Structures are given as structure tokens and as C-alpha cells.
């Protein structure tokens, strides 16, 4: 029983796909570091994340998938669902092995279906966040919003709020993942510290 273990990053998963073809192995399990190995598993292959290998795999996907298919992969990854690792890995491997055009549209494939459904869950939540996020004004004039979404949707909603509130400073902070994005009126930057400072002195 072949097992691959990776660092639970998207580059790590793409590197695992590269290793699968390079080693000519199709693992029955793709596990994140820290996951329990199944009984009777062979010595696991530990994937060493390689950005160049990951980039090669992604460029290959760009040749075989539509924009919708690439979108499915990118967005579903933001779900942070551990159960997605295996079907997403399987789906990407099938893209290269089968060379079926628009494989991402084959809803009868269980791996494709799982990736597609995960993508839909993330997109549904990001839409809900856009509709229901509410800001509070801090003493320094910054508008603050704290969210705790099930999925890592913050990267998907930032452009929306930059377009909508482009004339005032604001910070949207994900309390579950301990990071946020700060807009100073001209540019957006990722922030881990600004919220804690505002929370202590301004609110």
C-alpha cells in the first residue's frame, strides 16, 4: 500500500503529482504531515515541496484544462478540507494520464465531483461574506471587520471590498486563521499585527 506524505500546501500537492509520475507510482493515500498512517502501509514517500516542480505541473494543467478547471482547483484548495487532498490529487493525475479534454466537466467521475462540490462550497461562502460583512469604525478612522469563515475565503473577497470602499482605510481580519488584509486608501497589504494593535487601543 503506497502512501505519499506532503506538507499540506498546494505547491506540496502539485509536487506530489510530479513525484507520482517521476517515480511511476500512484499512491493509494495522499496524507498531510501529522496524519496517521493506515495499517499495513509501505514505507511512505515524503514529498519534498519543490516550487519548480509545482510550476511545471501547473503549466501542464493550463494546457489541458479550461479556465473553469483551473478555477476549480484553486478555489477548492481554499476549502482547507483535509478530505479533499486525495480526490484533488487523483483528479490532477487523471488530467495527465487520460488527457481527456475538459475532464473537469465529467460529473460522473467521483474525484471530479468532490473537487467541484468543494469549489461550490467555497464560492457560496465567499458570496455570503460579501453580503454580510459589517464594519466597525475604530478611533483612528479605520473600519474593522472580523470574520471566522469555515473556508479560507478572504483572498476571494478582497477585490470586492477594495472596489466598494476605495476611499477609506479598512481591515478585514480572519480570527480563525489569524491574518487579515489592510487597505490604507491606496494599496492592500496582508496583515497579522494591525488588528491586535487596534483591538487593544482603539475599539
Protein language model regions, located:
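Internal, well-folded beta-alpha domain core
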Residues: 101-190
